[in-house]
A protein has these predicted regions:
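S-adenosylmethionine-dependent methyltransferases
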Residues: 1-207
Length: 207
């Protein structure tokens, strides 16, 4: 539905992404036909995903030669930036269009150790396993906090490491407080987004 364009995301990586100039216009037209249509938050490279990339470049031991699962991946920038360092990687989102685009980029980059799946963090099948789980700015809706904490805790209890990137917004503290006992490491990043500087915290969660 959303027009895509090939963009240089890093010195080494070009990805197909939704055309930023077209997304709002297309969404506006679609919403006139369906007033309940949710905004495609997946269709943007968010500051949190850029901070996640920086963190994983600085600390690759969290993903090197490991099975990695990115949940709520959207475009999947962190996954694509580390795919060649992992054993296997799953890029997942609940939005089918996001997953279709991820599959296009997997083929574009000729990644044999990578697959994209439609997954809901509330109901991840038990056969989906990972050493490390990536979450970038998934905690934006307070009504989802309890369900997200339950899913995160479930993964921590089976021995997964979780790398979580989140903007410093007013709702962040109540969410992070629910996970306070699992915080192993925190790093802060300043990410330029247009004319703004966004403060992003990256947490490593372990049991």
């Amino acid at each position: 539905v959303y027009p895509i364009t090939l963009e240089q995301i890093s010195p080494e990586i070009f990805l197909w992404i939704p055309d930023p100039a077209a997304v709002k216009t297309v969404y506006k037209n679609l919403k006139e036909q369906n007033s309940n249509l949710p905004f495609p938050f997946w269709a943007k490279v968010w500051a949190s995903s850029k901070a996640m990339v920086s963190f994983l470049q600085e600390e690759p031991h969290w993903i090197k030669n490991k099975i990695v699962l990115e949940i709520g991946a959207g475009i999947g920038l962190p996954s694509f930036s580390i795919a060649n360092k992992t054993s296997n990687i799953i890029i997942s989102d609940y939005d089918r269009e996001a997953v279709a685009l991820a599959n296009k980029n997997i083929a574009h980059l000729n990644l044999s150790n990578c697959k994209a799946l439609v997954l809901d963090w509330n109901d991840i099948p038990e056969h989906i396993i990972a050493d490390t789980i990536l979450l970038s700015d998934t905690n934006y809706n307070p009504t989802d906090f309890d369900a997200l904490v339950i899913s995160i805790t479930k993964f921590l209890n089976i021995g997964c490491n979780i790398v979580l990137a989140t903007p410093n917004r007013i709702t962040t503290n109540p969410f992070i407080e629910k996970l306070n006992g699992f915080i192993h490491k925190t790093k802060n990043y300043s990410i330029i987004e247009g004319a703004l500087e966004k403060e992003i915290a990256v947490f490593v969660l372990k049991k």
